Amino acid sequence: MKICPFEITPIPWIDNGFYYDGEKISPAKHPYYFAGLYYLQEPSAMTPANRLPVEPGDRVLDVCAAPGGKATELGAKLQNEGVLVANDISSSRARGLLKNLEVFGIGNMLVMSEEPGRLERYFSGYFDKILIDAPCSGEGMFRKDKKMVRAWEEHGPEFFSKLQRSIITQAARMLKPGGMMLYSTCTFDPLENEGTIEYLLGEYPEFEIQEIAGYEGFAPGRPEVTKSKDPDFAKTVRIFPHHMKGEGHYLALLKKSEDAICPSSPVAEQKAKKIPAELEEFFRDVKWDLKPWRLDIHGERVYYMPENLPELKGARFLRSGLLLGELKKKRFEPSQALAMNLKMEEYAHTLNLSSDDDRL
């Protein structure tokens, strides 16, 4: 905040979110944006990642992660501990997701492009926390984006509810006992919101709806639109644009019982690698405890992998771990991803430039 060059005001229900006037300033053109100091996102869309209680060291899955606004927040919460699996079924969208995560210095990550059903093969009962920002009919975005109205006419709530039910049940099987899952949409239709959650609870009664940290503008979910009329649906949250300064959204936080019985993917063994001399020489200037068993070398490229991963042979990756750099002609060439991941105090040789320096 001390170095912020813009006039901003806090978003009252997001502890690290702020409004800005897009007619007066262009934050996406400022050097701080390219340095990964902030991400530009619609205010209501910040809420799902903010309300999923991720802790450092968690294993976290973002099922439908592109373009990366929620994934960057989840990665920041992990503080380079644990693992973030950021997935998007579209490989082209996943490339943008990877770019955003690397700009923000997220290193303990896997960026994948798989259908949730295939993810389940690798990550059964594996994750502590899962975020599902589900594809939806987009009714909550009609005010902001008129193209969403035409898209709704082509594929409405009935189409998306089938897709959502498939995604949420597959995700449920990837959550470990005691884990938490947050489901969100940017639509108003009960079929896609309370209806999807009711379907999950019918298929997997070991899940319970949890309270979401409140805000005076949040509206409760609607038990009356469900078959069960279960009052717990009032613990889910609806965000309406006429109540808050943000677009329409729905959120439901769920917990899997500690006693739930489900298969669990075993952790694969990570064998220690010999650290190449060129890499070892470079890291003499880096204040890291470089762990040899986390190194993964493919040709010239050197990756630093998260720990305690399952066997992932055959999975579709865009990135596995942090790309440290490349071994070229008996020297190590560090990557931009590594530069974004390192804190200034972690490297011996730095140059501190002001945002208005001509070299930027």
Language-model region placement:
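Conserved SAM-binding loop of SAM-dependent methyltransferases across substrates and taxa
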Residues: 67-80
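Conserved class I S-adenosyl-L-methionine
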Residues: 57-66
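S-adenosyl-L-methionine
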Residues: 87-125
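Helix-to-beta-strand junctions that scaffold the AdoMet/dcAdoMet cofactor pocket
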Residues: 78-79, 175-177
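Mobile active-site "lid"/loop adjacent to the S-adenosyl-L-methionine
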Residues: 92, 128-169, 186-193, 207, ...
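A short acidic, Gly/Pro-enriched loop at the edge of an enzyme's catalytic core
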Residues: 55-56, 120-131
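Conserved AdoMet
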Residues: 2-46
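Polybasic, low-complexity RNA-engagement segments
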Residues: 1-5, 247-250, 257-360
